[in-house]
């Protein structure tokens, strides 16, 4: 029961981060700032999922540079 609750909170946080990144994606600086915050806040498995999602969702050149810079340490 407890693990299920933790997993739900974890999924909710990851979904929240995805929503934030989508909404700020128009501004490169803000996008990078929010992505760095998310990487620090999420657990390792969530960061891996976020990384996969980001590279699929933000495939344009501008975001690729930011993703490569942020995920090099993640």
Task: Mark where each language-model region is.
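N-terminal acidic leader/helix
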Residues: 2-33
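Amphipathic alpha-helical segments that form the core helices of the histone-fold
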Residues: 36-43
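Amphipathic alpha-helical interaction elements
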Residues: 22-23, 39, 55, 59
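Short, charged early-sequence alpha-helical segments and their helix-coil boundaries
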Residues: 46-74
């Amino acid at each position: 029961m407890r693990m299920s609750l933790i997993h739900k909170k974890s999924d909710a946080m990851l979904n929240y981060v995805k929503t934030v990144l989508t909404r700020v994606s128009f501004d490169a600086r803000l996008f990078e700032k929010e992505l760095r915050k998310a990487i620090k806040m999420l657990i390792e498995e969530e960061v891996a999922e976020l990384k996969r999602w980001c590279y699929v969702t933000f495939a344009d050149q501008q975001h690729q540079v930011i993703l490569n810079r942020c995920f090099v340490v993640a």
